[in-house]
């Protein structure tokens, strides 16, 4: 290609499985990218997501964030975005794809790859600030901050392996309708933004600044891996993994700012494939692949079997019709009996900011409540309320009036 590389596929590996040479190449590449002040440097690429805003076009008087959330093209926009960073890192010397941080498995510690403040390079007897530990936000003279919620990140499920993220992604992967999958998938992905950013403004938890934290690309490499896993499951289920059955017009609409071209997007590959429908064939178009497409050690066959096992009992879900509220938010909900006794039933997060593109899902986000109802001796036909509380990223209470009351959905086996 025009960068002097042959088109061999880069492999995206777990951050915990990188060889010393791979880790060194990534650290030096990101350090170099962060020092690159061109239109293809770190600050420019970070601005693709939200701030300084480039949409609807850079010369517009009133601009908003280009990143896609709350819409069917969320997976495709972020696939392009990881490619944008991956190609930039390769130009700066990386020999491996963007590694992924697998947060579906119970975490015992935070990976040193991004948690160590100092990078010690034993080969060259050098040490310097680890570029994956943070970054400057040049346009407003701030630095990325983290307020990591280790309680949620390290929390095992009742059986150990069945973490919050595992259960959320399993239900997303169960969906054979693309748009049903997308809603579940996107909300599941939001959790890591909230758990890494916490109550910090200049962080993963805020739509405007998330992409300035290098953890963003590690998280989105994993998010994209789970999207690729869904594609493999679709193939296994007899569907075309490169086709969707909904939002067809959106799939033909080029995604910004990738479609802009120079002087904003200098990457010819993401410009050429800026239509969402052109992102499905990621190996052919973007030349990367994953070391493992699995969830908690389950390959596609075993995952398919596990998903079918979940369907062998009657299930009850709480259904939420979500829309953007101009900020990131944490939602908790409880099941309340008619005598007033309430039991905590679940939680999820929304990623947002004042510059977000207005959005509203056209279908429900579903959260399973079968076990909570059983523990309280409730049947789906009994009378109970679902009570929501909503707080902003900085722990301010938010009115829940924006959302219609949750639905109760019964799914027989």
Curated annotation (Swiss-Prot):
Protein localization: Secreted, Extracellular space
Tissues expressed in: Hemolymph.
Main location: secreted
Glycan attachment residues as annotated in the record: 17, 127
Residue positions binding Cu cation B: 189, 193, 220
Molecular function via GO: metal ion binding; oxidoreductase activity; oxygen carrier activity
Record organism: Rapana venosa (Veined rapa whelk)
Entry coiled-coil feature ranges: none
Cofactors (names): Cu(2+)
Stated role: Hemocyanins are copper-containing oxygen carriers occurring freely dissolved in the hemolymph of many mollusks and arthropods.
Family: Belongs to the tyrosinase family. Hemocyanin subfamily.
InterPro entries, alphabetized: Di-copper_centre_dom_sf (IPR008922), Haemocyanin_beta-sandwich (IPR028999), Haemocyanin_C_sf (IPR036848), Tyrosinase/Hemocyanin (IPR050316), Tyrosinase_Cu-bd (IPR002227)
Name of the featured protein: Hemocyanin type 2 unit e
A GO CC term attached to the entry: extracellular region
Cross-link 2'-(S-cysteinyl)-histidine (Cys-His), where in sequence: 67-69
Sorted UniProt keywords: Copper, Disulfide bond, Glycoprotein, Metal-binding, Oxygen transport, Secreted, Thioether bond, Transport
Disulfide bonding pattern of the chain: 55-66, 179-246, 336-342
């Amino acid at each position: 290609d025009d960068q002097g590389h042959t088109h061999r596929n880069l492999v995206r590996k777990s951050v915990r499985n990188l060889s010393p040479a791979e880790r060194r190449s990534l650290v030096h590449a990101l350090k170099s990218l962060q020092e690159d002040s061109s239109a293809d440097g770190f600050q420019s690429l970070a601005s693709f997501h939200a701030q300084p805003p480039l949409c609807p076009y850079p010369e517009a008087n009133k601009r908003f964030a280009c990143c896609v959330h709350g819409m069917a093209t969320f997976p495709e926009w972020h696939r392009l975005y990881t490619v944008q960073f991956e190609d930039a890192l390769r130009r700066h010397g990386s020999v491996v794809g963007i590694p992924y941080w697998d947060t579906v498995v119970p975490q015992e510690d935070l990976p040193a790859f991004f948690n160590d403040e100092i990078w010690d390079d034993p080969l060259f007897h050098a040490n310097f600030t680890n570029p994956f530990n943070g970054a400057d936000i040049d346009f407003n003279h701030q630095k990325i901050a983290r307020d990591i919620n280790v309680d949620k990140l390290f929390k095992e499920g009742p059986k150990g392996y069945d973490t919050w993220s595992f259960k959320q992604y399993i239900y997303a992967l169960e969906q054979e309708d693309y748009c049903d999958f997308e809603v579940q998938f996107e909300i599941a992905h939001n959790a890591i933004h909230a758990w890494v950013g916490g109550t910090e403004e200049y962080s993963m938890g805020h739509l405007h600044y998330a992409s300035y934290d290098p953890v963003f690309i590690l998280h989105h490499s994993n998010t994209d891996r789970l999207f690729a896993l869904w594609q493999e499951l679709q193939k296994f289920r007899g569907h075309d993994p490169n086709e969707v059955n909904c939002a067809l017009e959106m799939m033909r609409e080029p995604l910004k700012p990738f479609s802009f071209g120079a002087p904003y997007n200098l990457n010819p590959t993401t410009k050429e494939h800026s239509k969402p429908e052109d992102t499905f064939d990621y190996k052919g178009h973007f030349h990367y692949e994953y070391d493992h497409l699995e969830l908690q050690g389950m390959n596609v066959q075993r995952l398919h079997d596990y998903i079918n096992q979940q369907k062998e009992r009657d299930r009850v879900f709480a259904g939420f019709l979500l829309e953007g509220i101009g900020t990131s938010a944490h939602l908790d909900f409880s099941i309340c009996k008619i005598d007033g006794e309430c039991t905590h039933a679940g939680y999820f997060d929304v990623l947002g900011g004042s510059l977000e593109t207005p959005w509203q899902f056209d279908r429900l986000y579903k959260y399973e409540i079968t076990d909570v109802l059983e523990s309280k001796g409730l049947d789906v036909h009994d009378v109970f309320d679902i009570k929501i509380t909503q707080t902003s990223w900085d722990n301010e209470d938010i009115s829940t009036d924006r959302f219609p009351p949750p639905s109760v959905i019964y799914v027989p086996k």
